[in-house]
């Protein structure tokens, strides 16, 4: 009878990465790093049958989402996921991918990327050991709360993923991390890029002086205030904020238009100011805040955002840079 002390039980399966088309380049970089790191790292269990597949040339599991001429699609797996800890990587705001529908070219929207992810999960048919979704930009994160007769799309998406068998969701700088309340019994990890912001800022602008007399962190609206406070606490500087005055009698493109940005805080005259937010969409609000800070005699203005969507293009930013805004 074998000695039970030689039996090893591990609570994890072998690693598998499925980068969808929207996140293919990043997935390949992660795969290359993991393969190199595991090959160089010492592990006493490498030759143990329990850890079979620990060291491989690649951890990517091949998948695809081919489309019919009608625009409908299906998820397919070319590799087995049985007993595997699968990490699915998806970038729902990658607008560079196109497909044909009824002979016409159509750009993939966040809804298309999200649907493809669900198709791949469905193709696993419950055979994976665990499923983790890595979604840098949280799908529908801006629709995190209800105003009157509106759908709660982000909460619905999270509950839908959990219902499909997803064990953990990893995202970066969620628009409102409290949306995880929709799935209180499942994993939701929100990773903040504060360290990367500070490191890049100091490397690119070495003459910054980090004190309250020379620097100030600005929140462009009420929603970004928590980020601004957290960032300012790390730098040891003061915080200011703008709030948006809206015209609630009018709706333009699905939202109440902004009438003006009003400032709350100490004087910014002669100071370097940092505007921080989770995303730049069209960029109009960010640039309006920057112009107002310049009008208040701020020395230099830096805009930091986790996600640069630039839905209206980059021309307005190039123009603002040229004008010294």
Annotate each predicted stretch with a short phrase.
Residues 1-325:
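PRPP-associated nucleotide enzymes
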